[in-house]
Amino acid sequence: MKKIAIDAMGGDYAPKAIVEGVNQAIESFSDIEIQLYGDQSRIESYLVKSDRVSIVHTDEKINSDDEPAKAIRRKKNASMVLAARAVKDGRADAVLSAGNTGALLAAGLFIIGRIKGVDRPGLLSTLPTVDGSGFDMLDLGANAENTAEHLHQYAILGSFYAKHVRGIAKPRIGLLNNGTEATKGDSLRKEVYNFLASDSSLQFIGNVEARDLMSGVADVVVADGFTGNAVLKSIEGTAMSIMGQLKSAIAVGGVKAKFGALLLKSSLYDLKDTLDYSSAGGAVLFGLKAPLVKSHGSSDAKAIFHTIKQVRTMLETDVVGQLVEEFSKESDVND
């Protein structure tokens, strides 16, 4: 049985969206147990009772405006902290939260801990492509500043995730840059390019541009945390803007527009599904000793369900256990 600890109080619509997502997951998957951390009375008002769901009550939670590291240290009984502690103590196999991103990353690093050999775990998410296959990108903001060695390791981590979680035999690795030529970019990008090009274990395809990401140019895209986060927000904003513009155009377009929308209904739903990044799950802080997944702060029940599904896949494939073994081999070689 796969045990998942969930911060029920994190996110814009907690605990309602969190608990309703849990209800869907419990109904869909018979091999998971959920531990919900938070206000018991509020959780119970939305929970469909199940012997595979338990509640650990706490009145304390980390707010969106709390300073991450201080909150983790001072709010020792916060729902997020208790969920992370359950993983560290072996009472749960993975942790999920839609709460304060910085605090969750701090909980991952300070409570769960890094895998030996991983310098800086990267925040990885699967983002949409027009053909529906998606691509993995990291780092999405766990680290504002990176060295070339960090980005090389992100490529290794991303390739490993794509292979073991998404089932891509030879993931194509692209380096996000301001042009596709090998000579493009600043000194950091040029140094990273040389690292990746000389690593025979990676299927490195060269530099990729932001405009080509959603066309599926690569299976894994490597970026420093600052740039990756900016691109992530751009993709999210573009997806929301496109759907908003379509709705607005149909609403004010009169009878012809509404009739046209009716004829295109299935195609519009397909477009909506293609642009819906939440269906791929949350962002993984990959490189920790256990799966830690951040769901979007505005996640609804559907997004929480898909994030639980993602965590279940990570546990089913034992991707973290295999990653520990992989880095253990590298450490032995380096020693």
From Swiss-Prot:
Stored SUPFAM superfamilies: Isocitrate/Isopropylmalate dehydrogenase-like
Highest taxon above the source species: Bacteria
UniProt keyword list: Cytoplasm, Lipid biosynthesis, Lipid metabolism, Phospholipid biosynthesis, Phospholipid metabolism, Transferase
Known function: Catalyzes the reversible formation of acyl-phosphate (acyl-PO(4)) from acyl-[acyl-carrier-protein] (acyl-ACP). This enzyme utilizes acyl-ACP as fatty acyl donor, but not acyl-CoA.
Family named by the database record: Belongs to the PlsX family.
One GO biological process term: phospholipid biosynthetic process
Catalysis performed (reactions): a fatty acyl-[ACP] + phosphate = an acyl phosphate + holo-[ACP]
Database matches in InterPro entries: FA_synthesis (IPR003664), Phospholipid_synth_PlsX-like (IPR012281)
Descriptive protein name: Phosphate acyltransferase
One Gene Ontology CC term in the entry: cytoplasm
Pathway: Lipid metabolism; phospholipid metabolism
Localization in the cell: Cytoplasm
Cited HAMAP family: PlsX
Protein source organism: Streptococcus equi subsp. equi (strain 4047)
Primary localization: cytoplasm
UniProt gene name: plsX
